[in-house]
Design a protein with these regions (language model features):
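Short alpha-helix capping/helix-loop boundary micro-motifs
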Residues: 24-29
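Short coil-to-beta transition motif at edge beta-strands of beta-rich domains
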Residues: 1-3, 35-47
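C-terminal output/interaction extensions
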Residues: 69-102
């Protein structure tokens, strides 16, 4: 399973771990709830030996948040915004390599 650390690029603050991703959206698991209806500038590191760039940086709007099955964590769903073709290809490669499926 691919649990990359996800950061707010504007503040440098660690937000949580990527739990799932598609070209349309992502789910992040975090220790505290994230604000809804907010556009975040997100970034996550990529293994340099696999992907053409070191980080995946993207804008995403938080659209839902709920408690995880573990009450110490929260799941937040994001709609990904304005991805370019290279980022879509990287996300599709992540889906294939780490078995993310709808």
């Amino acid at each position: 399973m691919f649990y990359s650390r996800v950061f707010n690029r504007k503040t440098g603050r660690f937000l949580g771990y990527l739990e799932n991703i598609t070209p349309e959206g992502a789910m992040i698991i975090s220790e505290s709830p994230l604000r809804l209806d907010e556009v975040y500038s997100l970034g996550m590191s990529l293994p340099e030996d696999i992907y053409p760039k070191l980080a995946l940086n993207f804008e995403a709007k938080s659209i839902w948040c709920k408690s995880d099955i573990d009450p110490n964590f929260y799941n937040t769903g994001f709609q990904l915004l304005d991805l370019d073709e290279e980022d879509i290809a990287i996300i599709e490669q992540i889906i294939e390599e780490y078995n993310f499926r709808d």
